[in-house]
């Protein structure tokens, strides 16, 4: 489990792309721990992308907390545990270059297909209608703004998480 990437951010030059290694010390990286990619005290406004390698299966809820300067986060097809609220104070675009059986990202909306939960709305989702989901996850719409002044919730919606509409 990768616990801290601050040494990458506390350099004179933050790389344009932070590619998390698939192995550390000969062991596979299977997860990203709390605050692993927090840039609150680092990076100084230097934009970068993050590539999470194939083999990573889970991300803890605070792994990307305050990862302000990331512009894109690419997740692997092996990811199968991405909790609600994982992107608090994040405004990156999300993608799955190799696809993913559990998660989809369309029109900037990251959805857990298994639970039909909207987990995150990237900046590119602004002005798009909220997709037909059963749940709006915690802080899911932090980056989303409706087209106009009216918020239309999908008819399929059954529950709304904490701070889901605080965007």
Protein language model features and the residues they cover:
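Short beta-strand/loop segment at the start of cytosolic alpha/beta domains
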Residues: 1-10, 108-109
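The N-terminal extracellular segments of secreted preproproteins, especially immediately downstream
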Residues: 4, 37, 65-66
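Active-site/binding-pocket entry motifs
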Residues: 6-10, 38, 116-117
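Structural signature of tandem-repeat unit edges
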Residues: 13-30, 42-58, 66-81, 90-108, ...
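Hydrophobic pocket-lining residues within nucleotide cofactor-binding pockets
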Residues: 24, 36-37
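Extracellular beta-strand-rich solenoid/capping regions of secreted or surface-exposed proteins
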Residues: 32-34
């Amino acid at each position: 489990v990768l616990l801290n990437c601050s040494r990458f951010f506390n350099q004179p030059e933050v790389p344009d792309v932070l590619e998390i290694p698939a192995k550390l010390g000969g062991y596979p990286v299977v997860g990203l721990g709390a605050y692993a990619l927090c840039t609150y005290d680092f990076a100084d406004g230097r934009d970068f992308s993050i590539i999470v390698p194939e083999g990573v299966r889970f991300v803890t809820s605070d792994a990307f907390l305050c990862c302000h300067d990331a512009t894109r986060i690419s997740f692997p097809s092996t990811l199968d545990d991405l909790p609600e609220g994982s992107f608090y104070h994040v405004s990156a675009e999300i993608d799955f270059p190799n696809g993913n059986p559990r998660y989809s990202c369309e029109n900037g909306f990251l959805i857990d297909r298994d639970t039909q939960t909207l987990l995150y709305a990237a900046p590119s989702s602004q002005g798009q209608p909220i997709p037909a989901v059963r749940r709006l996850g915690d802080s899911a719409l932090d980056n989303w703004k409706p087209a106009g002044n009216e918020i239309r919730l999908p008819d399929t919606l059954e529950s709304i998480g904490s701070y889901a509409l605080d965007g």
